[in-house]
Curated annotation (Swiss-Prot):
It is an enzyme of class 2 (transferase). The gene is proB. Pathway: Amino-acid biosynthesis; L-proline biosynthesis; L-glutamate 5-semialdehyde from L-glutamate: step 1/2. This is Glutamate 5-kinase. ATP binds at K14, T173, D174. It is found in: Cytoplasm. Pfam families: AA_kinase, PUA. GO terms for biological process: L-proline biosynthetic process. One of its GO terms (molecular function) is glutamate 5-kinase activity. Catalyzes the transfer of a phosphate group to glutamate to form L-glutamate 5-phosphate. GO terms for cellular component: cytosol. It comes from Methylibium petroleiphilum (strain ATCC BAA-1232 / LMG 22953 / PM1).
């Protein structure tokens, strides 16, 4: 652990709802002040830090006097709008005590799915870092209802790490780290001090849901580490109330669980494609095409496509799945879904006669394809 964190120059820190709001009792000023002191100290060491903070909905619930998390989307959105005010004010106040400027950045996964908006978000965050300002990032829950239902800030933390090419992602949680089983239920649970991010066994170990305040459990943290590893960022999962946890990690101390990035770093455009959470459509391919993509690094040709699902246009990111539903890859479509249906199962030599024109002989070119 010492080398991974000690050498990290750009770090994304993610903190969850239960920590930020002290289990839903409202924004925990002391805890946020403590993290901000550590962030300021890291910045003083010449490191660049970004904070991904949950807690807007939980803080809004407290301000509105709600004891239970509502199920209606419009009520969740209202709580997020109310709570985001207090959250931003608290971070600004605590960071300013140390002479550090802060910036509020609200993102949705849709912002990162559009290539131009993705690059704009990246440019903004890198500019803030160059100005010695600490971005405080959250999902824009007020306007995107499907993220309130299914999203989580662990995923957002990984997406931000990939967006800015961070060296490390630190996920602060209410648990000491990852165990082989839920330690609250299994006294034989074994603590995992270090593992390789993306190891399938980790996902089996981390199964289970989180608290009623937040949206993720340990499984979302393991999956976030896997996602962050694709850009070369290693992940630490640690207890957020451990004294000086960020400073001690940066000094190389072994705290929590380290999930090391061992996969090859993706090129920038392929990283953007890999980070898509919601694809416009899907093409289902036969076993021969699966082998060509996986084993030979070939482009996807229309003749290997057996089914086209969804509606998409040329240039959209689409999923490529096997006939048993496993995602094989994703990439930029050379043809719209209506065109793809006409040329599926046909040799590339027939594209022009079928469509009246031919963009490319491939459904997805290998340079625009990233394997799952």
């Amino acid at each position: 652990m010492s080398e991974v964190l000690r050498g990290a120059r750009r770090i994304v820190v993610k903190v969850g709802s239960s920590l930020v709001t002290n289990e839903g009792r409202g924004v925990d000023a002391a805890a946020i002040g403590n993290w901000c002191r550590q962030l300021a100290s890291l910045a003083g060491q010449g490191r660049e830090v970004l904070m991904v903070s949950s807690g807007a909905i939980a803080e809004g619930m407290k301000r509105l006097g709600w004891n239970a998390r509502p199920k209606e989307i419009h009520e969740l959105q209202a709580a997020a709008a109310v709570g985001q005010m207090g959250l931003a004010q608290m971070y600004e106040s605590k960071l300013s005590e140390h002479g550090i400027g802060s910036a509020q950045v609200l993102l949705t996964h849709a912002d990162l799915a559009d290539r131009e908006r993705y690059l704009n978000a990246r440019s903004t965050l890198l500019t803030l870092l160059s100005l010695k300002v600490i971005p405080v990032i959250n999902e824009n829950d007020t306007v995107v209802n499907d993220e309130i239902k299914f999203g989580d800030n662990d995923t957002l933390g990984a997406l931000v790490a990939n967006l800015v090419d961070a060296d490390a992602l630190v996920i602060l949680t209410d648990q000491p780290g990852l165990y082989s089983a839920d330690p609250r239920k299994d006294p034989q649970a074994r603590f995992i001090g270090e593992a390789v991010a993306g190891t399938p066994e980790l996902e089996r170990m981390a199964g289970g849901a989180g608290s009623s305040l937040g949206r993720g459990g340990m499984i979302t943290k393991v999956l976030a580490a896997k996602r962050a590893s694709s850009s070369g960022a290693s992940t630490v999962i640690a207890w957020g109330r451990e004294p000086d946890v960020l400073l001690r990690l940066a000094d190389g101390e072994a705290i929590g669980t380290l999930l090391v990035a061992r996969t090859a770093k993706l090129a920038a455009r392929k990283q953007w494609m890999a980070d898509h959470l919601q694809m416009r459509g899907t093409v289902v391919i036969d076993d021969g095409a699966v082998a060509k993509l996986r084993d030979e690094g070939k482009s996807l040709l229309p003749i290997g496509v057996v089914e086209v699902q969804g509606e998409f246009v040329r240039g959209d990111v689409i999923a490529v799945r096997s006939q048993v539903g496993i995602e094989i890859a994703r990439g930029l479509a050379n043809y719209a879904s209506s065109e793809a249906r006409l040329i599926a199962r046909k040799p590339s030599s027939q594209i022009e006669s079928l469509l009246g024109y031919s963009n490319e002989p491939e459904m997805i070119h290998r340079t625009n394809l990233v394997l799952a």
